[in-house]
Amino acid sequence: MASTRVLASRLASQMATKVARPAVRVPARAFTAGTKATPLQAVKRQQMSSIITATRQITQKRAYSSEIAQAMVEVSKNLGMGTAAIGLTGAGIGIGLVFAALLNGVARNPALRGQLFSYAILGFAFVEAIGLFDLMVALMAKFT
């Protein structure tokens, strides 16, 4: 027990002196007025535009870089577009039902043909708007 205390204190004192010392000793260098070479000279020689474009390319990369992850993103985009496009089937069925009801109504009462036709066009516009909205969602899922 006592030996571990002595060993621990000795290790602590050695580590404290090692931390305080620099890892590498650099000889003192006299700078003259004739040479103004600095460690940043290589960076100064580079074009700023090339540095900026390099950092932009780094920041524009996605958070994942594997090919499998990239393929999974593409597959999920296509699946999302496909499932959203199924709604276009509903729009087609809705338009068919609107005009089927128009034909049925005109067959029952031919005198209301003009008024029923205006209602049918209004219903067609509403159903078509839903279909176009669905198409927009599908394209947004694919291209974003």
Swiss-Prot record:
Any one of the GO CC terms: proton-transporting ATP synthase complex
Transit peptide, from-to: 1-63
Stretches that traverse the bilayer: 83-103, 120-140
Subcellular location: Mitochondrion membrane
Bilayer disposition of the protein: Multi-pass membrane protein
CDD domains, per database record: ATP-synt_Fo_c_ATP5G3
Keyword Chaperone: no
Keywords per UniProt: CF(0), Hydrogen ion transport, Ion transport, Lipid-binding, Membrane, Mitochondrion, Transit peptide, Transmembrane, Transmembrane helix, Transport
Entry's family note: Belongs to the ATPase C chain family.
HAMAP family: ATP_synth_c_bact
Function field: Mitochondrial membrane ATP synthase (F(1)F(0) ATP synthase or Complex V) produces ATP from ADP in the presence of a proton gradient across the membrane which is generated by electron transport complexes of the respiratory chain. F-type ATPases consist of two structural domains, F(1) - containing the extramembraneous catalytic core and F(0) - containing the membrane proton channel, linked together by a central stalk and a peripheral stalk. During catalysis, ATP synthesis in the catalytic domain of F(1) is coupled via a rotary mechanism of the central stalk subunits to proton translocation.
Name assigned to this protein: ATP synthase subunit 9, mitochondrial
